[in-house]
Amino acid sequence: MTRLTSRRVASHSSVALAVAAALSAAAHAAPAPALALSPAPGPMIAMSTLQEVIVTGKALQLKSLKQRSIYESAYGDKALDRQQLKSAGVVGGAAQALSFAPGVSVSGYGQTGGTKASISVNGLKQGWGGFSGGTIDDGSIAVSFDGIPMVNAATGLWETPEVPQTGILQGARVTYGPGDPEYRWYNNIGGSVNFVPVQPTANAGGSVALTYGSFATENAVVILQTGKIDGWETVFAGGGGRSDSFRTSPDGFNWPTRNFAGFFKTRKEFRNGDVSFGAYIGDGHGWRPTPIPLTPNALISANGQDANGNPLPGPLFSQQTTGFYSAINSSVWKKNDYNRTWLVYARQNIQLDKHVTLHNQLWFRQGNRLHVHYNNYVAGAGNLYEHNNPFSHMYGDKIWTDIYLPYNKIGVGGFFINTVYNSRNQFYSPNACVTLTNPVTYTAYGQNPTTLATGSTICGSAAVPNANYRSDYWHVTNLDAFFQDAITPIASLTITPGIRAVSFQTDYNPNGATEYPEAAALDAYCNTVGGSCAFSGHDQGKLGSVRTNYDKVEPSVSARWQPLHWLAIYGNWATAYRLPQVGGGGGLYQSTPAVGNILERSVEYQAGAKLFWPEIGAFSKVLINANYYHDHFSNQFIGVSSGNGNFLGLGTGDSVYHGVNLSAEANWRELKMFANLNEEKANFNQYDFQGTNYNGMPVPYVPKTTFNIGAYYHFHTWHGVVLKPRAWYQYVGTQHMFDNNLGAPSTQTMPAYGVLNLALAATVPGSWYGNAVKKVQFKVEVMNVTDKRYNIFEELSSGGLYNTAPSYVGYAMGLPGAPRAVYGTVAVKF
């Protein structure tokens, strides 16, 4: 078998970035035509404000966070500014911040940005925390950073620790549903999220923020603005932190985590546009505790089991016995979960004439995961260690143009994206050994055959795994071409029909036997000799190489009518496709043939109304949005795994998500207020797993209700000091669980919960410090003020994780939410 490497990806990405730099330099060096950046006169402006010509990247990014941009959208979008992001708490990451958009809920195992979490947007998921064995709709949300896609195009997944530091963000925009063709990527089944980092400014300055608090939490964020130097504006931003978990094992292990992020962007504006270059790295890693049984079980000891499955002496492990926030002893189970992503990109925006703008962006992304797992819960386990180190590389180019005409704004363009993903993973135990009774020969890549002599003893290792292993490659190419026309026949009405042609091309190549040739040979040997041969694992890439290609057309239409200056009524309909999730220990390509149409499909429509008053009486910045949505998600492929990581099978489904989102925000003098509400119902029209039909069952982990409300006030006190008290409350309603024993949804629900948070900040003017700085802020936050005990996630066990099957299955396990925590921050702006 040919050994596959990422060498060709690296060379292509280097070429792509070189081309980006050349295009940017050429655009900057070219003589600029005498064009004004102001909108063209005449009917273009008279008909609709949507005809405004926006050229610079800074304006495009920051405009997306403005209330007026939300008001002018024909979708139920939500923009979270810096103040709303702070609702996540000073050490909360991307997942926690997004939970303050309507219809968004989060489940995870930690309180900082360094731990993984799952995000649900109107019921559809993104991110992964290693929780339930059933991943119903994961990977259905597109995620981008500064407009650059972050999601692994092969697996569809994005890990929340890739954006662990919200302190370097300007805001985030959430789009519900696929959206118009111009703004889609390759997995916008359920919507998209764009994280907008701090942007370069014309004035020099910066800030430093230092935080310390509960669970030995430490965090620092630094932002530096160079101001305009030779026409270039540049920003450097970064942050890092560490924390112990709020869960502690009986043996005292505190499950620590760490994270950091760094961002650089430089931009130069010229007469007819701008050019920018950016780079980003996000990293989060830490020890991940297991779900804990809610009630005690005689088979589940905090010290594990002996080789015969008998519980070892020690306390029974459950929330009722070892403590609500307890974790399994690290001497029997622990896992370090590491995630990192790099982005490098270039962007050009050029106004070609008074009617046409050209946009281009090129990028390269690399993603790495590393799971180092120790599992001695059952003494002498053959899979004592796991070393899971997959990686992905992506490069792409998106080019498009906006054409502004008297009654139309036309968008036309497309993108090319190439991704390589490797699923490398090894399970092994150095205590699992085999002594050969006859010789075994294997051939490593690029080497002569090697023979292991009779009598040789070989033990498991990361290089020669004795348990399951894999190293499979997916080469995925995504192509997109789109056309949309925002037609404005009268000033108050805009209708935007669109069409998008998409292509998903996949080359799959199993590479386990090439990556681990000695293990493959010993696997074959053990199959021959039989008995309790130690090398009983198998290459999880069971099927051969295959190439698939799927081409689809995605029609859409959106409409917005503004009968009054403060009222807009909107609606939209769209079809979108995506590749199903792949890359674990089985499923499509690896153990299930990828035949027929495997593309997952979404057909969604929305209808709603928005009210917007920049000023009305004593109120300002009033924005209210009411939205109904209905999403039919079909041709679903649902991988089901046991609690100890074994792939059990592939389910198929067809489901409907529908509900209502309400959001409101307003200022009343110095009082700032926001509130968000979601009511949703999601059910399977059809769900089949291993020959059993579960039609009509609820889709797991879709809260019936989510609600949040918050407010803060500016008190101007003595000598320029400003006090800002803040309060916010978050409620998550009941949600159905997944039954890992059945591999199917359950009618059982986990309880609702609500959490209250408070903060107080005092901002001292720079005059107190001789104007050496602009201002200094002192802040105290109290998260979960009432110390509410609740589980943020629950599942029904198959008995695999704690080796209780078949005697004891179907019991509930949970991940507790964080208890009360107090954080103090000192921030200096200069």
Regions found by a protein language model. Give the residues of each.
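C-terminal beta-signal and adjacent terminal beta-strands/loops
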Residues: 2-4, 730-738, 762-830
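N-terminal periplasmic "start-of-domain" segments of outer-membrane beta-barrel proteins
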Residues: 51-89, 115-118, 174
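Extracytoplasmic beta-strand/coil segments of soluble accessory domains associated
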Residues: 62, 74, 93-149
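A beta-strand signature from Gram-negative outer-membrane beta-barrel systems
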Residues: 150-156, 162-207
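Transmembrane beta-barrel wall of Gram-negative outer-membrane proteins
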Residues: 205-207, 211-242, 247-304, 309, ...
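Membrane-embedded beta-barrel scaffold of Gram-negative outer-membrane proteins
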Residues: 351, 357-363, 369-373, 562, ...
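Structural signature of Gram-negative outer-membrane beta-barrels, strongest in the C-terminal barrel
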Residues: 407-409, 415-417, 470-631, 712, ...
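Gram-negative outer-membrane beta-barrel transporters
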Residues: 491, 495, 617-634, 650-740, ...
